[in-house]
Design a protein with these regions (language model features):
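N-terminal secretory signal peptides that target proteins for export/translocation
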Residues: 1-9
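Bacterial N-terminal signal peptides
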Residues: 11-25
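C-terminal edge strands of extracellular/lumenal beta-sandwich accessory domains
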Residues: 30-51, 97, 128-152
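Surface-exposed loop/edge segments in extracytoplasmic proteins
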Residues: 54, 101-108
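Extracellular and analogous surface-interaction loops
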Residues: 62-64, 69-78, 120-126
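Hydrophobic beta-strand segments within beta-rich accessory/binding domains
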Residues: 69-87, 130-134
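Exposed beta-strand and adjacent loop surfaces of beta-rich binding modules
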Residues: 79, 90-94, 142-144
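Short, surface-exposed beta-strand/strand-loop-strand elements in extracellular ectodomains
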Residues: 89-104
Length: 152
């Protein structure tokens, strides 16, 4: 007798079929963990330059054209990089850093390359800074993103 996921199948079998279908759909769509992997991939060359990547990170999902602000305490005397990534290869993302007065604070070597972006800041003073992440465009309705950072 062939197994099936029809409504007449037993409740355990239907439950198992739904679990498998959900798992397959989830893995096909990607996750914030996948996005974090890409963000960490962006950080690799900077680790060789002496940057220490922090374990904490931010993540979520945004639609095309949406932005999110992340507040972070930065310290004068340190140098920081913020790296953003997404698993959606055809997405275009960005990350920018502003000081507490709303002035752009990032260095000119900040960059955007498709589904990777990075912003570099050397704070002029200790205080709260605002990191603005955005999904500029994406073929997906919602795009997972993750932001990691490092300092030296």
């Amino acid at each position: 007798m062939a197994s099936s996921c029809s409504p007449s199948a037993g409740s355990l079998q239907v439950s198992l079929c739904l679990t498998v279908a959900f798992t397959l759909a989830r893995s096909a769509a990607g996750t914030v963990d996948d996005a974090q992997s890409f963000a960490l991939q962006s950080a690799e060359p900077y680790v060789k330059e002496g940057f220490q990547v922090r374990e904490d990170y931010w993540g979520g999902d945004l639609g095309s054209g949406e932005k999110k602000a992340v507040r972070q305490q930065l310290f004068k005397g340190n140098e920081y990089w913020f790296w953003m990534g997404t698993e959606v290869e055809r997405a275009k993302i960005s990350v920018h850093i502003y000081d507490s007065e709303g002035k752009l604070a990032e260095q000119p070597d900040s960059w955007e390359k498709g589904h990777f972006a990075a912003a570099h800041v050397i704070p002029k003073g200790t205080g709260s800074y605002f990191v603005i992440v955005a999904v500029e465009e994406s073929p997906e309705e919602r795009t997972h993103w993750a932001l990691v950072y490092g300092f030296r």
